[in-house]
């Protein structure tokens, strides 16, 4: 059985008296991972620890079954990193930089040239490969950063805020590119404070707040699947009482209900209650809990 993508054991990281990460525990499976939390939550610090850039103050972490402190070089050979801010040399061409990056990973020069060409084509920069980074748009620079992160064919790529500063078209392009990595067998960890980006690109979610993990689960388990939303015409109190009497979970806002029931056909249950109460119905249909809803609920805690 393959090892988890990431394993954390009592992991903490401090800067002087400031605790950036506090006692993180958990395993993250292989796949497309979303690391989500507000700015300052500890996402970038966690990535730097997982890359072996920062040594943990306490505890341990493994990436692809390798210790980030004891097997750092071997681990780094199997991962890629797209930083939040690029620092790409403005006077260098994309082709030259990608060849250099491939050679740093131990790829011979001739193979590095071919690999650089292939990866630039993949990210849509083949026509711009001989242009200098100083002439690139923000979207092109982001794609170049992604290219350097995968030029050595890693098993896992860390993407720190990969959609930052992009316009809607650029965001769509980056979503597509991140999605394509899965078809090449590359696992991804996408760090973002934009919840819709995580919903679009990931199948597992790690929520972090104040340096602590508050949720670590499959995305579909986090968003909670489908409930039924119904708007009645009158007598909402009677409808709520009838639904609760049948064991349904009910959230009501005026005439609008979100109803979750263990019944095989929730629509039939709701329709029966509406008929018995004579409340009438304006509309009824599926209601999907978004990742943003789940995150806000997790922040508030149980009511």
Residues covered by each model-derived region:
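Conserved ABC ATPase signature
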Residues: 91, 132-139
